[in-house]
Amino acid sequence: MNAKESLKDKRQVAIVTGGSRGIGRAIAIELAGLGFNVVINHYDFTADGRPDETAAQKTLSDIAAKGARCLVLRADVSSDADRVAFVKAVKDKFGRCDMLVNNAGVAPLKRADLLEATEASFDRVLGINLKGPYFLTQLVAKWMIEQQIQYPNRSYRIVNIGSMSSYTSSPARGEYCISKAGVSMMTMLYADRLAEFGIGVFEIRPGIIETDMTSVVKEKYDKLIADGITPIKRWGQPEDVAKAVSAIAEGKLDFSTGQVINVDGGFHLRRL
């Protein structure tokens, strides 16, 4: 440990966007269990459109129970001003960031055929799912490079939560598929660009995971899973994705930058 570091700096810090619920919540709790202090970003609303802190505060409580410190920050990742303020708040609170998990993501508010989908829906989904993480990574990567110069013995990693939709056609939610395909290329680009600084960049591709997002199509996927759409015939759980993030956080894949990790019950396998 660099002699300049104070005692308060010893615990690693991870940022998890969309960290209040679902996959993000599971990742945040998993990282807290590994000894990270955790920053969770969220942008939750109640059913009637009011800002909602309920899920974020529950996640904060569960992280604290692991003995970790947690900072909850409400921010819209698609907003440049929010991203800048968000990163500044992390710097002010913890003074470091060792890991960024770009997890925040949305589905279209209404599934619509490709020939009927609206530009407003496209802009919303691409803004949150692709533009947001693309430019948040830019901000955090620059900060990581600065840290790497000052503290060369630390390790820095970025994880993008993609989707099997990055390569699977779903014409009723084309904007979502395009956003996740973009995340795949974003991962390769940043892995290439940041390798010289020792910053590993990875993509995790979840399959059919039981979350709020998939609850609206549960009956459909129950049948597909029972019929064998995945070799492992069960719903994936947020904790399955969190375990993959854990392996990266522990440095077990540091020579595998740019790698895609499928957490999909074998969906990606081509079978006859």
Give residue spans per PLM region:
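Substrate-binding pocket helix/loop in short-chain dehydrogenase/reductase
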Residues: 111-114, 118-123, 226
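Canonical Rossmann dinucleotide-binding motif of NAD(H)/NADP(H)-dependent dehydrogenases/reductases
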Residues: 2-43
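Active-site helix of classical SDR
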Residues: 137, 179-182
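Short C-terminal tail/terminal secondary-structure segment
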Residues: 2-5, 111, 228-229, 246, ...
